[in-house]
């Protein structure tokens, strides 16, 4: 499906890229820029879920304590499925620094990312964000 300014997939990829770049720079307003006000996020550290922009904003305080602007926050293996009004994207995120194979306290780590997006008046907005790591059992 072609939209003004490119395909839905290319526009969503640009939104996700801008979000990841804002995370790397610790730019909170850039992080929030493409999110809906009633965002729902499921994250790895508590709380189990964050509902609404105010709660979502608070989650970044903890992240910024451990992630330095010079460290990785790289989107890999991005796959986007887009319809006219809704889309989802899945990816692996490389976060931090170090080996990326050990626990977070050893440096970098990988996590799974799932995003749910809605097309609102021609702009793709993130309505749901889910971060997860596999069980280590």
Predicted regions and their residues:
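A beta-strand edge to alpha-helix "cap/lid" segment located at domain peripheries
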Residues: 2-30, 40-137
């Amino acid at each position: 499906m072609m939209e003004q300014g490119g395909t839905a997939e290319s526009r969503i990829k640009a939104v996700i890229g801008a979000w990841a770049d804002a995370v790397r720079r610790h730019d909170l307003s850039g992080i929030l820029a493409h999110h809906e006000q009633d965002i729902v996020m499921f994250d790895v550290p508590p709380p189990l879920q964050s509902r609404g922009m105010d709660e979502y904003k608070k989650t970044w305080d903890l992240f910024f304590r451990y992630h330095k602007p010079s460290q990785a926050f790289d989107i890999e293996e991005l796959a986007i499925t887009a319809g006219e009004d809704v889309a989802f994207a899945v990816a692996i995120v490389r976060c931090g620094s170090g080996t990326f194979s050990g626990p977070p306290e050893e440096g970098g780590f990988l996590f799974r990312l799932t995003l749910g997006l809605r097309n609102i008046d021609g702009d793709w907005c993130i309505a749901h964000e889910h971060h997860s790591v596999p069980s280590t059992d």
